[in-house]
């Protein structure tokens, strides 16, 4: 029987890329899922298919502690996946206060509501590779300091540290995830490099690279991310992992230019990318070691970058036909 059968699970950020895939997988595995939704996003992957009819939706925002407390109590929640965030770096630079409110205040509201709620057994908080800021040594491992410098990075460093506080001070069973750049069909943030490139190529337009093209990142396929989150939550108790942070990555690094050229090749396109060289406040080289997850969780990703990109291109090709 699935670990998740009849578990009462609360998911924030369920209209986002990761949240929508995670919710669907939890429902498939028999969980009773309740999602916190601020804005109605009808094009979200969450609303594709029948899963939406099998979950509860609580309307509200992370900034409203009373809404979160009510949801945890009324739906007798035992597991929380806190995925919601203002996740766009450019938006964060333009609107730091609203980003801090969503990402920092929102996180402590979730954790505080969980602290007061007696049924909570496990909380997973989505941090980010950006929480590390810029480090001299690569790849980043979980023992490196959290030292974001710009609004989005700092918001993730803070949320990450606050999560540790709730474990060390109150014994809250919380784990933190730090992933590379997530991608996959259903990401509607078209200022992100993969969906933007695919959209432009489908329209016959040259893809644009905001940076100089040499920035190195690791790209992590969404279905691998879902399995990583579920595995961590499942093993938290038996492996005594509360208070731990885990990097998840397929540990394949690409420059932005290499990534775009890979997509062009897979789409049989002769278009040439336009390198704009406008990237500001971005870390030049950033990628993660997932050795801890491999050792302690016996985790391995299922998808190569090529397999993930092929599935992603297929999704957007169908999406833009509608």
Curated annotation (Swiss-Prot):
<dbReference type="InterPro" id="IPR016040">
    <property type="entry name" value="NAD(P)-bd_dom"/>
</dbReference>
<dbReference type="Pfam" id="PF16363">
    <property type="entry name" value="GDP_Man_Dehyd"/>
</dbReference>
<feature type="binding site">
    <location>
        <position position="128"/>
    </location>
    <ligand>
        <name>substrate</name>
    </ligand>
</feature>
<feature type="active site" description="Proton acceptor">
    <location>
        <position position="152"/>
    </location>
</feature>
<feature type="binding site">
    <location>
        <begin position="8"/>
        <end position="36"/>
    </location>
    <ligand>
        <name>NAD(+)</name>
    </ligand>
</feature>
<protein>
    <recommendedName>
        <fullName>Putative sugar dehydratase/epimerase YfnG</fullName>
    </recommendedName>
</protein>
<comment type="similarity">
    <text>Belongs to the NAD(P)-dependent epimerase/dehydratase family.</text>
</comment>
<keyword id="KW-0119">Carbohydrate metabolism</keyword>
<keyword id="KW-0520">NAD</keyword>
<dbReference type="InterPro" id="IPR036291">
    <property type="entry name" value="NAD(P)-bd_dom_sf"/>
</dbReference>
């Amino acid at each position: 029987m699935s670990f998740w059968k009849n578990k009462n699970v609360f998911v924030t950020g369920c209209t986002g890329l990761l949240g929508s895939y995670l919710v669907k997988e939890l429902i498939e595995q028999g969980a009773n899922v309740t999602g916190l939704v601020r804005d109605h996003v009808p094009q979200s992957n969450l609303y594709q298919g029948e899963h939406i009819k099998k979950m509860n939706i609580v309307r509200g925002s992370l900034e409203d502690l009373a809404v979160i407390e009510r949801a945890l109590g009324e739906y007798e929640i035992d597991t929380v996946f806190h995925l919601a965030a203002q996740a766009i770096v450019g938006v964060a630079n333009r609107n730091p206060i609203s980003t801090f409110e969503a990402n920092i205040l929102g996180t402590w509201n979730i954790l505080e509501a969980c602290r007061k709620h007696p049924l909570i057994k496990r909380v997973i908080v989505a941090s980010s590779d950006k929480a590390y800021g810029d480090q001299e040594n690569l790849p980043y491992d979980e023992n490196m300091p959290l030292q974001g410098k710009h609004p989005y990075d700092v918001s993730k460093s803070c949320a990450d540290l606050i999560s540790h506080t709730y474990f060390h001070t109150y014994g809250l069973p919380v784990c933190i995830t730090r992933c590379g750049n997530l991608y996959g069909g259903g990401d509607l943030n078209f200022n992100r490099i993969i969906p933007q490139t695919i959209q432009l190529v489908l329209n016959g337009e040259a893809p644009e690279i905001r940076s100089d093209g040499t920035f190195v990142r690791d790209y992590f396929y969404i279905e691998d991310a879902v399995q990583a989150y579920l595995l961590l939550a499942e093993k938290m108790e038996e492996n005594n992992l509360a208070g731990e942070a885990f990097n998840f990555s397929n540990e394949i690094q690409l420059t932005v230019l290499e990534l775009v050229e890979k997509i062009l090749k897979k789409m049989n396109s002769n278009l040439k990318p336009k390198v704009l060289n406008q990237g500001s406040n971005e870390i030049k080289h950033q990628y993660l070691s997932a050795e801890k997850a491999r050792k302690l969780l016996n985790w391995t990703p299922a998808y190569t970058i090529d397999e993930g990109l092929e599935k992603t291109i297929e999704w957007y090709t169908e999406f833009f036909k509608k």
